[in-house]
């Protein structure tokens, strides 16, 4: 599907130079004083991980990859593969662990429903939910009278990830973590 260069957004997957590329940063729209407007894109190759910077005229058309999405339930990890179960047919599939960002892998908890995006029947990317609930395993003790302030303290979560949390939280509490930037959202209800 063709897409106008100025309609490209961060996270779009494009077919460019016979490869699949993900737009890894927000496109930079520039209108110089002289000449036509252009869009600067930072793209990452989905297979090799290499980054390139390309400049396109705002009137150029690029090929946006058509991906199929299907929901699966994460079961467990086996060597360099993840075992997922199709929620409709209950078939199990193996996908490479590399289709998920390494900083988000600890947040892939058993029985989590994930979306697998495929291109020509090949898994390209595994999309986690926007937020997950995780328990704080270790953090410095509560500060008496602490309120919501700008100061945060480090905490280690039950999945081994490190995150900054407000000072009023203590070990054993469950929190909601936003996976986009791996940040604290709120106490779990």
From Swiss-Prot:
GO cellular component: a single term: cytoplasm
Annotated keywords: Cytoplasm, Elongation factor, Protein biosynthesis
Main location: cytoplasm
GO biological process: one example: peptide biosynthetic process
Role description: Involved in peptide bond synthesis. Stimulates efficient translation and peptide-bond synthesis on native or reconstituted 70S ribosomes in vitro. Probably functions indirectly by altering the affinity of the ribosome for aminoacyl-tRNA, thus increasing their reactivity as acceptors for peptidyl transferase.
Family, as annotated: Belongs to the elongation factor P family.
PANTHER family per UniProt: ELONGATION FACTOR P (PTHR30053), TRANSLATION ELONGATION FACTOR KOW-LIKE DOMAIN-CONTAINING PROTEIN (PTHR30053:SF14)
Protein name listed in UniProt: Elongation factor P
Gene this chain is encoded by: efp
